[in-house]
Amino acid sequence: MLDVNNFEYMNIGLASPDKIRSWSFGEVKKPETINYRTLKPEKDGLFCERIFGPQKDWECHCGKYKRVRYKGVVCDRCGVEVTRAKVRRERMGHIELAAPVSHIWYFKGIPSRMGLVLDMSPRALEEVIYFASYVVTDPGNTPLEKKQLLSEKEFRAYLDKYGNTFSAAMGAEAINKLLQDIDLVKEVDTLKEELKTAQGQRRTRAIKRLEVLEAFRNSGNKPSWMILDVLPVIPPELRPMVQLDGGRFATSDLNDLYRRVINRNNRLKRLLDLGAPSIIVQNEKRMLQEAVDALIDNGRRGRPVTGPGNRPLKSLSHMLKGKQGRFRQNLLGKRVDYSGRSVIVVGPHLKMYQCGLPKEMALELFKPFVMKELVEKGLAHNIKSAKRKIERVQPEVWDVLESVIREHPVLLNRAPTLHRLGIQAFEPTLVEGRAIRLHPLVCTAYNADFDGDQMAVHVPLSAEAQAEARILMLAAQNILNPKDGKPVVTPSQDMVLGNYYLTLERKGAIGEGMVFKDTNEALLAYQNGYVHLHTRVAVAANSLKNVTFTDEQRSKLLITTVGKLIFNEILPESFPYMNEPTKSNIEEKTPDRFFLEKGEDVKATIEKQEINAPFKKGILGKIIAEIFKRFHITETSKMLDRMKNLGFKYSTKAGITVGVSDIVVLDDKQKILEEAQAKVDNVMKQFRRGLITEEERYERVISIWSSSKDVIQGKLMKSLDEVNPIYMMSDSGARGNASNFTQLAGMRGLMANPAGRIIELPIKSSFREGLTVLEYFISTHGARKGLADTALKTADSGYLTRRLVDVAQDVIIRETDCGTDRGILAKSIREGNEIIEKLEERLIGRFARKPIVHPETGEVIVGENELIDEDKALEVVEAGIEEVWIRSAFTCNTPHGVCKRCYGRNLATGTDVEVGEAVGIIAAQSIGEPGTQLTMRTFHTGGVAGDDITQGLPRIQELFEARNPKGQATISEIDGVVAEINDVRDKQQEIVVQGDVETRSYTAPYNARLKVVEGDKVTRGQVLTEGSIDPKELLKVTDMTAVQEYLLHEVQKVYRMQGVEIGDKHVEVMVRQMLRKVRVADAGDTDVLPGTLLDVHQFTEANKKVLFEGKRPATGRPVLLGITKASLETDSFLSAASFQETTRVLTDAAIKGKRDELLGLKENVIIGKLVPAGTGMPNYRKVKPVSQVQPSDDMVPVE
């Protein structure tokens, strides 16, 4: 058996008839499958044991030889070799065809490869192959042309006229003759000559032909191999036939298709032997051709062959295609052993790195480990009795299980796995019951809740797998989100509420102004009811052992609350004492105003001070981030557990409930509504008088109602009591927001109709008061649309992620530094006047391309190729620098990947990225995962020009697929000045741009808003009208840099508008993949073909070679491909075939004789090799374990 890990590459090509015969173990002559009485395979049939091997291990067909001792013997009676039955999965057979047939992939594909080689149209080919016309194969000395088509009538006429001086034929034989006659070298030379002069359609056709002919010439495939003389028969175990309960048989469709071929082939042989009339033979040949077509790709031509119940049969091509095909079903998505799944419930008592595993499940999953341990401990004599013990669940098994699972991590996965945090490792603890217990803090990463979600468990078996799970995948190690580098394990819901309640302050609470010597005394007073959690008290600062207090602060009293004393117990000692939710308190120290001299009037000071806000969800997140930055990850995870425990404890103590009485309806509501109604009546009056248009009226009415809803919302939030439970829930960030709240107690506001247009009649009632029937009816539209949108969005978002992963799957960090001298100029991203992404955010974790110098002092803040961290980024921004040259994936020179310097920091760990990190997949997941949070709809701006601006998910798809956008903007193709703007017919406007050399005029579409005025200076690629730019147009008039920047900014705009943060580098990696190809314009003296798409690296290599010899290099233009197109254009045919258009990709690859170098991840998963990323990188795989070496004297012990 060949070892998968020793593969270097994989080739694909056309099989010659001799090659097919050499694969085969015998010819299949009969269409029979198995004998219905003996249920044994028929001889020479489709399941013949002589050809394909025995059905039972070490046993021949007739039973003369049984047992392994006859291994390799060929039975003299039945001719079956005695061997393992599994050879029936690998041995092939063949069928000798009585007449050649064409292979439908090469004849029917688009473009028709056979047609291109022969320079015939697919129509003509079809007529010849399916016996409708004759084709002249050799005109002899007649005026006929070679490859000329003749109808039956014409053929007869010419035959009478010229006799046998010319030859014409029909069917695949004729095509075969023509293909054999082709002189590839001569054809290629003629085409190259023709290319020098050809234009238009002739040129494109010539380029296509040249590509195919060159492919045949370079790959060593012969064109005549596109015609089959021999048909391979795949191994019988891959097209099985099984007996069902009722004695009936179920069989693979392929057997039916093979049977049809064999039947027709045998009939044709008989007819030929009998010397039947040509018309009958021709018909039989055509039927054979159709049978082979159906076998290879049923339904590609004409009506598909159907089985019982009019179901089209699944041919060989269908076995590969689509989600259920071989690639996606069995090679990329295997089911694995040592796995289980169950419902999840919350495990609030667990530590960050633990999960609860049901006992029965654990026993089954760790069975082999338990068996080994039982034998080793002497509790069972052998493996068999150990197995029996486990199956009977004897008591001693549980103790062994406990010891086996200790320190053995398991992987938990929740579908859909949208990003890498969808699978994490935990240390199992055994629990009663049948549900898996999950730590509450990892729910955000999994997007899990406990309303019936299920999760899968997998056991890493080998020592390496366990080590990787423990070091890289343990939940306690994955605190940051790979998409933006912010903590993903932040407390939510109850935990937020508990910590919020704990850190509340109230004026005049019981025991205000008491002074305590330390925390314990304060807690004692709290437990005995002298003070409340929210009471402001004073504590001796030196008793708190906080390292960040200054000496002066230590000698004083600290004003705080009992709750905050408790909260600060969970923070490390060297972290500032948290007394107010401000940036300075988190990052620097506790503000001085909370300290007072001993002996001052505590009560009076407290009464003077303002109340501090409690700690909301965002602040908790910032505290976690800061702790992560300052301390080790272990410390952070311990602190998170403590924060979780506090949250649960105090949300329970708070006893927060919601009752109807908590929803207080606003007193002024009626008055506000009446004022709004008066304004609306006024607008209607103006409209009736014809002072405003219908559009304006609609816009104004909508804006009046929405502003009155905002007024109600503002007043409502102010009127609420601090300790109103609903207010606390929404203010802390635990659940609900101001808008939900307004709907409960204020008014529901405006609703949209099913078409998405806003209905101008608002819903004035709130849920507390109850809706009228009409109001209820109006609000159902929105609810229904919401549900429908969500369902559609999930599917769309998933498909987007799949395409993104596919295009970037081979982008891996391959080296430390690619040595490029290019970079990008980073400045803050703006939308109008609003900053969408600050410069500071764009700089953190990147390498500087040029030294960054302080504009005033001239000191170097960051050197060249030095990492910019948070402090340096802040320094740069504070120095007033607005743009910085940084290294970027856009300009990285590493082939098939990115280098460490151009990528920068790994957002998931906050440290340098490692060589071998699969950054392409991380990027794809980071962009795809928030896809479900984006909106589906295009915003309808009530019929205003510059119409529907696409946003949300559709806009992201539009950008990554490089489609022409909706509401396209006109851009200037030259640098110059706007000379004039004229009105032309139908409210269109003409913009004339005058450059130094030429003048261009552009017609802006009806009602478009212009972005320039007369006399403005414009540069090429600048927008003249409002709307989105077509990136392909932009690439034509500007360069790659402009397009890269445009796509990056646009993608960021969509996500940031929806409040989703994504690191720039992820978008950069994706956009880089879209701009990898160059379209060759002129080949120069290189071997490349004009008009072909080449990888940038292949293009530069080809040019380097020629330039060294002092010849003319090729020229080309960068091409922007959408992600689907880019995935299909990848160098790896395995990856492309498993993505989409499987047959087209394989046809193309076979003709070109492509070699897959197995550089990406998908290709390696398909052939079952370790992926070349992480510890699977070739340079790590070659590390050999050394025997136990004694430390030598010159070794230095590590501190």
UniProtKB/Swiss-Prot annotation:
Its EC number is 2.7.7.6. GO terms for biological process: DNA-templated transcription. Zn(2+) 2 binds at residues 818, 892, 899, 902. Keywords: DNA-directed RNA polymerase, Magnesium, Metal-binding, Nucleotidyltransferase, Transcription, Transferase, Zinc. InterPro entries: DNA-dir_RpoC_beta_prime, DNA-dir_RpoC_beta_prime_bact, RNA_pol_asu, RNA_pol_N, RNA_pol_Rpb1_1, RNA_pol_Rpb1_3, RNA_pol_Rpb1_3_sf, RNA_pol_Rpb1_4. It catalyses: RNA(n) + a ribonucleoside 5'-triphosphate = RNA(n+1) + diphosphate. Binds 1 Mg(2+) ion per subunit. It is an enzyme of class 2 (transferase). One of its GO terms (molecular function) is DNA binding. Signal peptide: none annotated. SUPFAM superfamilies: beta and beta-prime subunits of DNA dependent RNA-polymerase (SSF64484). Zn(2+) 1 binds at residues 60, 62, 75, 78. The keyword rRNA processing does not apply. The keyword Zinc applies. Its cofactor is Mg(2+); Zn(2+). DNA-dependent RNA polymerase catalyzes the transcription of DNA into RNA using the four ribonucleoside triphosphates as substrates. HAMAP family: RNApol_bact_RpoC. Belongs to the RNA polymerase beta' chain family. This is DNA-directed RNA polymerase subunit beta'. The gene is rpoC.
